[in-house]
């Protein structure tokens, strides 16, 4: 993994994938960036896998014929996005399609293509490729536990929940879900430049 992190190719992938989040969900991007500031101040021994990216973790599927079965990434931030880049050499018209089951979408996914999805929300997979073809994938994401750790003032989840009764927990859960969805952007907001955030200071410092 040290070689991957040192690779200029993967460094560029990581920055591009982070910029994809900024371009399509700028308010969500800023939520990631603002969470990183206190997290890294509290834990200076932690280091992001790639400079210039707000994602804190990555996974590489080395294949050589990577196929993901239908799943949800339930440990990621519930309303967070995962960036996935397809790599390899395969006929993308006949295989390697990206499938979003909840939306009944089957998407052509050529090598070098990046997609961003709320991977904890939607069930997703990809289709098989030919026996002589090769397919790999590079994904970036952030675990939901890191956001809870910061928002609960660096208190373990079990200890934090002991300070709340059931009614409070239900209200907090509903409010968190609603505030998370509010970080998504509509196409009208993106086209009109009327998104909820304009301050990119933290993001510029990642």
Model-derived features: where do they sit?
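Active-site-proximal segments of catalytic enzyme domains
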Residues: 1-139
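Catalytic core of Fe(II)/2-oxoglutarate
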Residues: 79-80, 89-206
């Amino acid at each position: 993994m040290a070689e991957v992190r040192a690779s200029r190719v993967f460094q560029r992938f990581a920055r591009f994938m982070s910029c994809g989040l900024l371009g399509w969900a700028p308010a969500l991007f800023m939520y990631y960036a603002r969470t990183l500031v206190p997290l890294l101040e509290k834990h200076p021994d932690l280091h992001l896998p790639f400079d210039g990216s707000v994602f804190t973790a990555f996974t590489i599927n080395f294949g050589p014929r990577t196929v993901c079965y239908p799943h949800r990434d339930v440990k990621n931030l519930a309303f967070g996005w995962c960036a996935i880049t397809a790599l390899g050499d395969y006929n993308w018209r006949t295989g390697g399609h990206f499938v979003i089951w909840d939306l009944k979408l089957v998407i052509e996914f050529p090598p070098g293509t990046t997609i961003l999805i709320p991977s904890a929300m939607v069930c997703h997979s990809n289709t098989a490729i030919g026996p002589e073809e090769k397919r790999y994938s590079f994904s970036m994401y952030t675990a939901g536990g890191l956001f809870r750790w910061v928002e609960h003032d660096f208190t373990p989840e079990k200890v934090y929940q002991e300070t709340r009764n059931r009614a409070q927990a239900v209200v907090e859960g509903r409010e968190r879900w609603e505030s998370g969805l509010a970080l998504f952007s509509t196409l009208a907001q993106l086209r009109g430049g009327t998104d909820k955030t304009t301050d990119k200071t933290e993001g510029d410092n990642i």
